[in-house]
């Protein structure tokens, strides 16, 4: 789990993602500005984003939070720590959510992303408890009897304050691959068209047939489907990110990216591929420097090298 601070760097939204981005930000602005007390019914603002692994679900939510000017708390169900686990050296997730909500009390609002929702749909005893805690968040309900990171009781008035924040100024977004939705759609077909162009996104009827009923109960029809990223999308993102690179790094970034994009697209690495690419680019550059110094030393040879004892050399 990590809390992501906003920065001023604009995020890349592909044309195929624009409609999804616009809907997330539109609902986010409603969350921030709407007086819900005027309505006799609850306003359902939870959003569920589905798309195959590497489609850029969490990337899109972070971009929306940045556009809205809001902090985002990212949660993964695979890293969720249950209430009562503090005694085993772990910090439960819900007290951290409470901290985030109390921070947002003094801000226009916030975004909470619950990623990997598809991983809590089986029926093990562990996921039963995990599902209960995650669904409390989706139901906009802060559990009672919380303790903080130090094990001290969180007072009831603080829990009630967090509850008001959660229900009035927090956009809750769920995300999950629900990979079975996509597996049958990527089987090779006979024909001349590229397989990239034949991957069809599921429609609303498909989602209602496949998604667990208890998931649908928390989101209704407020579902967003992200189309898969194909190789051309990766090259488009490379060009945009390269334009933002310092001049020294830009050609290196492009060269390494073009070499590795086919594998990245095949492995469905998604937008995080470019973060890894930056590290690999720097590693390659550092290795080139190390090899240069080594070759320079080997060519001159230790017998021919003149070393000033007052000067430091790095090899």
Identify the residue ranges that each predicted region occupies.
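Walker A/P-loop
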Residues: 44-75
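C-terminal alpha-helical "lid" subdomain
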Residues: 60, 231-315
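Conserved C-terminal "switch" segment of AAA+ ATPases
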Residues: 67-71, 106-107, 192-267
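Conserved nucleotide-binding/hydrolysis micro-motifs of P-loop NTPases
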Residues: 53-55, 67, 78-82, 117-120, ...
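Canonical AAA+ ATPase core
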Residues: 59, 118-124, 130-228
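Pre-Walker A (pre-P-loop) alpha-helix and adjacent loop at the N terminus of AAA/AAA+ ATPase modules
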Residues: 3-46
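Short glycine-rich substrate-engagement loop in P-loop NTPases that contacts/grips substrate
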Residues: 72-107
